[in-house]
Amino acid sequence: MAAESSSQLSLLSDLTPPSLERTWLSAPHPTLPIVATCSSDKTVRVYSLTNFRLLSTITGGHKRSVRTCAWKPHVKGESVLATGSFDATVGIWRRWDSYGQTERGIEDWHRADTHDHADDMTNGNGAAGIDNDGGDGADEDDEEWRFAVLLDGHDSEVKSVSWSPSGMLLATCSRDKSIWIWEDLDDGDNNFETVAVMQEHQGDVKCVAWHPVEECLASASYDDTIRLWREDLDDWGQVACIKGHQGTVWCVDWEGAENVPSAPTDLADGDLATAQWKKAHALSGPRLVSCSDDRTVRIWRRQPKEQQQHQAQPSPFGGSGIPSIIRPTGSDEFWDEECVLPQAHDLSIYTVAWSKRTGRLASVGADGRIVVYEERLVVGSTAETMETDPPTSADGTAADSPAALRTEWRVIATVDGAHGIYEINHVSWAKRADRGRTEGTDEEVLITTADDGTVKVWTLKM
């Protein structure tokens, strides 16, 4: 499907210098204008999003490729990064934010690292090194990434790590088909406790992602399923198994809690339609998006509780297929496929990212294409396959919403061959921080990560 001509995705900058080996994933910091990238060269590189240059290189913690990383939220005074590697371990790294959590602070970090970044030197401490050849020694500890702890438990490659909204729980998943949940005891000694190991997946678990406000975990797997996990009576267990994809599910991501579809200027009573959509949407909560080897991007919506109770069957087994003696039927959730987004990829889709600021979606994959989608409210339009229905109540009628109120997803921008001939492994949204940004706005950039080692930053012009 052709993108609308009113939107354009343009290259803003490459992150320099790049890794000379495959890069897997880029994780923007939740508060600072920096991004961490994972590489096959066993390192994590931290770049500035203000000038797109390398700030530091984290080395020495892993023996094989670093596949994934995630920043811990709600940490004051320091940055905490979790990394997952093909060596089957998870590393926790810390760095004091002595420069402060402001853009001015990032400039301070630049001044502290005035060396030639391309030299990519480390301090040789055997754990973590920050590129720094100009320190006087007194502040050296403040400038280093500290290798805090190694979490060991998986039997094979770690594919994804994700912190819970509170930052107290860390979820990890692996090729060994398991999902582990670790609790950060926050005792000052970097101690973590294993609170759950889930092994219901029948294949390599590719991705884990936490609900934006609840302690609910979503996972995606080589077994073509998406599974939802919650804690019940001090035990973690599966509450839903979503089947719909016809191939490996590579990635899942959650909608932001405050997301609202855009209302076209020609939509009559746009404010009323938006209010009605929000009211109906609140019954189900944030939706889930997934992408797959089957070249589709799908959106899933949880049924409201009243509707779930109405549809529940008096069976000794819940919707997950687990006996009720282990997992009570009342804890099961029912998820519906809300829509399949417009077909826009020719090969496997590796990552889909849901912007928490704008509600737009971006997808990338083996075809080297970047696709950006936008959801729009429509009233009384002709039916299309990408249109979505509002949540329904137990009697099957639309909940507090006119029958004609719908949303539809449209492709608004595409870039072919974004990294030349190379596959794109990951895409993420980040708040724009360079000098070209528009002040007073929530302007965003897209960050794409590819097989050739490059990481590119893109702007979307509407």
From Swiss-Prot:
Entry's transmembrane regions: none
Q: Quote the SUPFAM superfamilies the UniProt record gives.
A: WD40 repeat-like
According to its UniProt entry, the protein's GO biological process terms are: iron-sulfur cluster assembly
Signal peptide bounds: none
Q: Does the keyword Repeat apply?
A: yes
GO CC, sorted alphabetically, is: cytosolic [4Fe-4S] assembly targeting complex
| Keyword set, alphabetical order | Repeat, WD repeat
Its domain of life? Eukaryota
The family classification in the record reads: Belongs to the WD repeat CIA1 family.
Q: Which PANTHER family does the record match to this protein?
A: CYTOSOLIC IRON-SULFUR PROTEIN ASSEMBLY PROTEIN CIAO1-RELATED, WD40 PROTEIN CIAO1
Q: What is this protein called?
A: Probable cytosolic iron-sulfur protein assembly protein 1
Q: To which species is this protein native?
A: Neosartorya fischeri (strain ATCC 1020 / DSM 3700 / CBS 544.65 / FGSC A1164 / JCM 1740 / NRRL 181 / WB 181)
List the taxonomic lineage. Answer: Eukaryota, Fungi, Dikarya, Ascomycota, Pezizomycotina
Supply the gene name: cia1
